[in-house]
């Protein structure tokens, strides 16, 4: 349920912590996570852009204490696509701003869509091949199907976390892969998700999960069920 309030702020300063996108929601820091279909807050509500949204106090395996420990800042909640999708959002990490209910002026649509589960899909090119990925601001490390890295030599190894993984952490090699999104070419650094995650993505017709490798390079607008850049 949404209760209208006398709050008209739709622009928020972004701060990064360990590659995670945080904003001050007025009742504690919020992790901005387009890869999460659901939001939560330890107070059971999130107040943004003139509205109050009733949300659970935690998600399975992930509450405020868990997220705080992973991102390195005291976080009160997470704002996901159940709020960001209907509002629309311009996520401008290079400019340091999150704008809700944004204008789409000066942007062009990217082949994309939002699934019934709340995930944001977009098309890009990886290693000269078309790839459909989930756009996830909650992913400091990006991931791509191993089929896109065949023959490549890792340039790094990293440890990442996910509450669905036994022990909640996993290691992955990282590769540099020629990629393109919204007409912009770049070298994407991406690893491999644990096998069962790759299988789940394959069932959704998805080749990977991309976060800061795109969001850190350009403003991205989510509006009216599409992605624009």
What are these regions (language model features)?
Residues 1-229:
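Pepsin/retropepsin-fold aspartyl endopeptidases
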């Amino acid at each position: 349920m949404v209760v209208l309030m006398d709050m008209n702020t739709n622009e928020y300063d972004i701060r990064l912590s360990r590659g995670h996108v945080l904003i001050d929601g007025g009742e504690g820091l919020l992790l901005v996570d387009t890869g999460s279909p659901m939001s939560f807050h330890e107070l059971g509500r999130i107040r943004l852009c003139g509205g109050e949204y009733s949300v659970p106090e935690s998600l399975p395996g992930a509450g405020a204490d868990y997220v705080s420990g992973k991102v390195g800042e005291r976080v009160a909640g997470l704002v996901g696509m159940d709020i960001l999708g209907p509002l629309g959002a311009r996520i401008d990490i290079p400019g340091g701003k999150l704008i809700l209910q944004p204008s789409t002026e000066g942007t062009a649509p990217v082949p994309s869509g939002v699934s019934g589960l709340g995930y944001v899909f977009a098309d890009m090119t990886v290693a000269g091949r078309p790839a459909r990925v989930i756009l996830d601001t909650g992913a400091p490390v990006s991931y791509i199907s191993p089929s896109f890295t065949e023959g490549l030599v890792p340039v790094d190894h990293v440890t990442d976390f996910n509450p669905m993984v036994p022990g909640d952490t996993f290691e992955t090699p990282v590769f540099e892969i020629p990629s393109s999104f919204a007409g912009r070419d770049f070298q994407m650094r991406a690893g491999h998700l644990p096998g069962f995650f790759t299988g789940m993505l394959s069932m959704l017709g998805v080749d990977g999960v991309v976060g800061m490798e795109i969001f850190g390079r350009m403003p991205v607008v989510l509006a009216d069920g599409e992605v624009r850049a």
